[in-house]
Each structure stands twice: as structure tokens, then as C-alpha cells.
Amino acid sequence: MSFLEGVYWDLDGTIANTELEAHLPAFNNSFNDFGLSWNWDISNYIELLKINGGKNRIAHYSKNTKLLLSNDEVINIHKRKQYHYLKIIENNKVCLKVGVYRLVKELYKKKVRQFIVTSSSKIQVDLLIKKLFKEFNPFDFFITSDDVKFPKPDPSPYLTAMKLSGIKSCKSIVFEDS
């Protein structure tokens, strides 16, 4: 009989609804800071989530408007978006998705190793986990966009995590929303 030894969690949209509670308002706040009249609504943002990475979303949206942004402008807007995102997290504006805390804690009690594999940056993950799991960190390690050459949906982040964990794929499960 095979027992579960490892769980690999996606973060945004799986552990917490960060996309709508933090990323979306952070994008809109950064657009406002730069004097752009852009205001992404929920349906527009959900469509933009098909594009991986915040900078890529900004660049894509720019191409579809009359305002073409330079690469430097995209980078600066994205840096400002990161600032707003971290402020939102710091102010406890994001919650765990229903049932996640209970499942994470139960797996932790049963000594099932848990890992986060995400397209978010390390600074985002560190702060979010600190805020969401106040009394403990149930995760052995994180694989973030800072750790891999090709972010998700490329399989390399998960393959990297599985290699680092040393757990066979037949004894693992992935929770992912994309």
C-alpha cells in the first residue's frame, strides 16, 4: 500500500484568493499611481489571468490600448504593484480559502510534508504565509518565480520541488488551480 508523503500546493487561487483580494487591487492602485486611466474589473482580470506573470499582463493590456508602454514603464508599474500587494497582505486583507487551514493542519499532524510551488516572488510568499499561518509554518520549503528559469505553467517548478523533496511522485499530490 502506498501512503501519501508529500503535498505540493499552488498559492494564488488555491491556498488563498490572492488574485481578487490582493493582486487585482494592487494592479489598479499602481495604474492610478502612474496616472493611467486603466481600471481592471473582475471579469477583465480573470481573462488576463490566462497570461502568466504580472509584467506580461501589463504589457499585453498595453498592446490592446492606445497607450503602448516601454519595457521600463512596464517594469516600474509592476514594481509599484508589488509595493501595493505587500501593503494589502500586511494589512490582513487576504484570507485562506475555505477548508485549506483544516487540511494543511491535518496533513501537518500526520507528518505529511508540504511545499509551496508558485509563480509569486519569495518576498510575497514569505509575507503571505506569515500572515495566513500565524502560529506555525507547515511548509518545508517554497519554490517561487525567483527559483526557476521558467515559471508555471512550465513543469520545471514542480519538478524542482519534487527533486528537492526527495519524495516519489507516486507518493505525492499537487493542489493547483490552473
Regions of interest found by a model, annotated:
Residues 22, 53, 95-99, 120-121, ...:
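Short beta->alpha linker loops
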Residues 34-46, 66-77, 135-139:
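Short, surface-exposed acidic
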Residues 63-105, 110:
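Metal-dependent phosphoesterase signature
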Residues 27, 100-130:
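Substrate-recognition element of Asp-dependent hydrolases with the DxDx(T/V) motif
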Residues 2, 109-112, 165-171:
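Glycine-rich phosphate-binding loop signature in dinucleotide/nucleotide-binding domains
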Residues 30-32, 53-69:
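Helix-loop "lid/cap" segments that line or gate small-molecule binding pockets
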Residues 1-44:
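Active-site neighborhood of HAD-like aspartate-dependent phosphohydrolases
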Residues 121-174:
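Substrate-recognition "cap/lid" segment bordering the active-site pocket of phosphatases
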